[in-house]
Amino acid sequence: MNPVPAQREYFLDSIRAWLMLLGIPFHISLIYSSHTWHVNSAEPSLWLTLFNDFIHSFRMQVFFVISGYFSYMLFLRYPLKKWWKVRVERVGIPMLTAIPLLTLPQFIMLQYVKGKAESWPRLSLYDKYNTLAWELISHLWFLLVLVVMTTLCVWIFKRIRNNLENSDKTNKKFSMVKLSVIFLCLGIGYAVIRRTIFIVYPPILSNGMFNFIVMQTLFYLPFFILGALAFIFPHLKALFTTPSRGCTLAAALAFVAYLLNQRYGSGDAWMYETESVITMVLGLWMVNVVFSFGHRLLNFQSARVTYFVNASLFIYLVHHPLTLFFGAYITPHITSNWLGFLCGLIFVVGIAIILYEIHLRIPLLKFLFSGKPVVKRENDKAPAR
């Protein structure tokens, strides 16, 4: 075990929480966007579609960089087996808890909302399995990907640590140009792999478990490893926390390219491959934009911020079925898209916070939704004075 910095990275905690909570306006705006979802408003909103595309273009790339950063920090804190156990418990237990308590009821509700309940018995065994894979994993996909990444990084992090012991890490130099070229090549590599699969056996791309375990892991693993490297090399971390006009401009241009691909691309042609290349480099540049912004404005301790940092995972887990309920039963009664969007935010966030406060008072639920054992403090046992 190696010592780890004692100073808390408040801005990274805050960014991770905000990225998680951005899932709420992302999914609510999806109802009012031009993208087809489980539930949609009668008429799409151009501006809410643009807002939805903006969040979707970079959010998870930056999230996985932060996850990799904190994962490697814990890797240095614990023995290898304990590290894997702690990491898998913290993401795996909430995921397994949310499936029967959240995504299964959500799936049943959608079966009736979309009028598919009657056709369910006629589906083949594989179609039932694949539908359940997509619908029960649902918005929990990133937790499954984190479990897979953690398992892979048992070997990857060991290799990184061993290489560091045999080299001088102070001489390692990074530049955004080099990183951009690397991530461009990674994006092209991912696109080639996806295209090859599409040519050889296209049905596998519609398999839910293959998509989550293989394709999503393959795309986001470079960002996870980049986060670990940012923890190891202060120069790399400083590269991300220092504002860069070049990164901001490049990210803006990449987002325009992303929108053009969404508008004019075709799923039967090269739209998905082009998107993977664009979002790979866009994600890298947005790491600089988000980190530098967060380092300047969010690097402080606050009771209110700490509350939402602690609550962000639970709120994210419960927001999805609440959003779909709102979209199915309340959205049709609100004629204004923007009013519906704001009402959706109030509805979902308000109920999610109430549920969070309730679950804090039930030790079993608190454990199941956090993956952390409830530790009773000695102060709690002291008699009142």
Swiss-Prot record:
Name of the molecule in the record: Glucans biosynthesis protein C
Gene name of the encoded protein: mdoC
InterPro entries the record matches: Acyl_transf_3_dom (IPR002656), Glucan_succinyl_AcylTrfase (IPR050623), Glucans_biosynth_C (IPR023723)
Coiled coil: none
GO MF term list: acyltransferase activity, transferring groups other than amino-acyl groups; transferase activity, transferring one-carbon groups
Stretches that traverse the bilayer: 17-37, 60-80, 91-111, 137-157, 173-193, 212-232, 239-259, 274-294, 311-331, 338-358
Purpose of the protein: Necessary for the succinyl substitution of periplasmic glucans. Could catalyze the transfer of succinyl residues from the cytoplasmic side of the membrane to the nascent glucan backbones on the periplasmic side of the membrane.
Phylogenetic classification of the source organism: Bacteria, Pseudomonadati, Pseudomonadota, Gammaproteobacteria, Enterobacterales
Membrane topology label: Multi-pass membrane protein
Entry EC no(s): 2.1.-.-
Primary site of residence: membrane
PANTHER family per UniProt: BLR4337 PROTEIN, GLUCANS BIOSYNTHESIS PROTEIN C
Subcellular location: Cell membrane
Record family assignment: Belongs to the acyltransferase 3 family. OpgC subfamily.
